């Protein structure tokens, strides 16, 4: 029978793989949407935000896929802390950019029919959820740091 520690480590690895898979699916979804806007020459969606979203999603896909594949190979590869923090910061910025980008496209309404549809709406709400989740995690981390410091 495996020890409790080994079981916990396996469960954490499984959760990590599931999270990475969700990140990969989300960024594939976003990257495909942005590429479709470019292919259809949707002028109302053409700005710096679209370029930022496209390139960030591409980088996130490469990094997440690499971590996903190496995780299944048995390697316990982790990103360096500084790079992980930088990637997380840009991830939060990306979530805000996607949220406001899709909000502006939604506000344009019939003036921007080329960007419409359920995909845009889904990306908008997923990015809002991502912002809320990230802010909750940040506030939780600050709370635990303050709480733990009081007991040390």
Regions found by a protein language model. Name each.
Residues 2-152:
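Eukaryotic polytopic
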